[in-house]
Amino acid sequence: MSTTEPAAPVAPLDITATEEWAALTTHLREISEVSLRDLFAADPRRGETFAAEADGLYLDYSKNRLTARTVELLTALARRAGLADRIEAMFRGERINVTENRPVLHVALRAPAGTRIEVDGVDVVPDVHRVLDAMSQFADRVRSGDWLGATGERIRTVVNIGIGGSDLGPAMAYDALRDYADRSIEVRFVSNVDPTDIWEATADLDPASTLFIVSSKTFTTLETISNARAARSWLTGLLGEDAVSRHFVAVSTNAEKVAEFGIDTVNMFEFWDWVGGRYSVDCAIGLSLMIAIGPPNFREFLAGFAAMDTHFRTAPFERNLPVLLGLIGLWYRDFFGTATHAVLPYSHYLGRFPAYLQQLDMESNGKSVDLTGRPVSTPTGPIVWGTPGTNGQHAYYQLLHQGTTIVPADFIGFVRPNHPGVGTADGAGVDQHALLLANFLAQTEALAFGRTAAEVAAEGVTPDLVAHRTFPGNRPSNTLLAQKLTPFALGQLIALYEHKVFTQGVIWGINSFDQWGVELGKVLAGRIIPELGSEQEPELGHDSSTNALIKRLRAG
């Protein structure tokens, strides 16, 4: 049960000073010269042994530079860090976000009805389902044509206005689940304060058939409210002030500000301060997604999250997908010294998934002090990046295979396609999805095992080209495989990475649920805005570079 008092920071444990860390350091020296070729040659069943599964989501982590002893030592490190207790603390609604004195309960957003999760002694799950029901009713009205615009037109376009978690999550999920969307309603997303964004989003729209969803917890976020005002001006300039109530709804906690804007608070869908922005796609922030794919599919999406939540909470660490991914990532970040992590989905629909994970991971674990404010003693969150396969193969895979930087990677694939493809890929009866999967598998194999100089020479390559066509291999990767990209599978994947990030944050002893690093830029921007716009020459008090740039911008 949560209390109003902040949870005491988990023991300010210097994880690098533990016996478990020392054992891993010693083990690294033992394994550093062992290649993946050696490991697979020594164990013909390695590909089956180093694998785990949860509700149809399969993880093959055999192509990593680790052994059973590595997994044993890493899981011991997780236990030493108190991971099991921290998992329970989160699910119990304790205020584990200690810098903001808040519970962290995105898991409540997808908890089945009847589950009990308390904040300050109050079960929050009924409230979650009340909002879900309200969202469902509204989404059904829009989809059926019962909700009409001010002139009696059906809604044909929904424009979601938000930024950060209010944009990245729903935009990613909308793209991912387009195969399940009602194609008679288009959803667009506006986030950038650059006026080009809102201009392009509305340039070809009919205001009479456009619905805006303004998503902002406080309804004061600079970029979001600026874009919302621009959208309001565009709409009222064509339809009049009275049209606002039929063409704007809000996702917020600030009813007063919503009403001031002109949105009827009956059409405000709430969420709670125990929901972080980057963990909010499965609450009212996902209203645009629910309108697109329909309430039943949205609830399947939530069911995927919930299944992974249960797995994370109950599975032994040795078979726990989020824990394994977190520990493997930490193994490379802290012991091998890798700085980046690639996420490579072999699905065109998951084009925005790496960008979504950038916020989830880098905003959560991009921290340099621990829970007590002391400098951390080891590197924390990696740089996360990636694009869909096979496009990336023709861009940066060259560096992955033959560059001097080791980049651990997650490959994500699906057994069955959402679309079968037209004709065959090569004229020999191989369809496009099989071609995609062949590349998906080939890349992990090539990264792991490479090609030796002797193998290249044996193919008849001229001696002057042998070095250029040799692949060092020993490049690590995980393979994630689901049957098909469905709402359930997407929910699983998102929750998998949420809990991976949490696992790493616990071991590093940092707060994965605040984001103070975004604040300073906002404060300084607040100073600069009037300096750029004032009629009188302002007295500038910045550094010489910023002062000179402001003067150049003012000069036009």
Swiss-Prot record:
Q: Which InterPro entries match?
A: G6P_Isomerase, G6P_Isomerase_C, Phosphoglucose_isomerase_CS, SIS_dom_sf, SIS_PGI_1, SIS_PGI_2
Q: In which pathway does it act?
A: Carbohydrate biosynthesis; gluconeogenesis; Carbohydrate degradation; glycolysis; D-glyceraldehyde 3-phosphate and glycerone phosphate from D-glucose: step 2/4
* Catalytic site positions: 363 (proton donor), 394, 522
Note the superkingdom of the native organism. Bacteria
Q: Name one GO cellular component term.
A: cytosol
Which UniProt key words apply to this protein? Cytoplasm, Gluconeogenesis, Glycolysis, Isomerase
Record localization: Cytoplasm
Q: Which reaction does it catalyse?
A: alpha-D-glucose 6-phosphate = beta-D-fructose 6-phosphate
Q: What is its main location?
A: cytoplasm
Q: Which residues cross the membrane?
A: none
Q: What is its EC number?
A: 5.3.1.9
Provide any one GO MF term from the record: carbohydrate derivative binding
Q: Name one GO biological process term.
A: gluconeogenesis
Top EC class of this enzyme: isomerase
State the family named in the UniProt similarity comment for this chain.
Belongs to the GPI family.
Q: Which PANTHER family match?
A: GLUCOSE-6-PHOSPHATE ISOMERASE
Outline what the protein does: Catalyzes the reversible isomerization of glucose-6-phosphate to fructose-6-phosphate.
Q: What is this protein called?
A: Glucose-6-phosphate isomerase
Q: Which organism is it from?
A: Frankia casuarinae (strain DSM 45818 / CECT 9043 / HFP020203 / CcI3)
| High-level lineage | Bacteria, Bacillati, Actinomycetota, Actinomycetes, Frankiales
Gene this chain is encoded by: pgi
